Amino acid sequence: MMAMSEAQRADPDVLIVGAGPGGLASAMLLAHSGLDVLVVEKCAEVGGRTKIIEQDGFRFDRGPTFFHYPEIIEEIFQAIGLDAHKELGLIPLDPSYKLV
């Protein structure tokens, strides 16, 4: 995250508690609209339930391994002038499942 001035830390326009996907998306949109946003997170890393835990050479997803609605992520990034696929490295699963 970007470093902020002491004034921004002391008096942000918006305080967001939690740096999971929802908190980060909200922060992106609000900051893009010109507000000073401060995100606070209790953990050392951002990501919330989308973090990965590594233990004994194995990787475990703490949250989703795929998003059912990637278009929502794409809309959020488009709203701030970025491409979600370039920024996040999203990989389409085609098909991820079939309804029969």
Range-by-range predicted roles:
Residues 53-54, 60-96:
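N-terminal FAD cofactor-binding segment of flavoenzymes
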Residues 31-56:
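Glycine-rich FAD pyrophosphate-binding loop
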Residues 20-25, 49-50, 59, 65:
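Gly/Ser/Thr-rich beta-alpha loop segments that engage phosphate groups in nucleotides
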Residues 17-20, 42, 63, 69:
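A secondary-structure boundary/capping signal
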Residues 12-39:
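N-terminal Rossmann-like FAD-binding beta1-loop-alpha1 element of flavoenzymes
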Residues 1-12:
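A short, basic/flexible loop-to-alpha-helix module at the beginning of a structural domain
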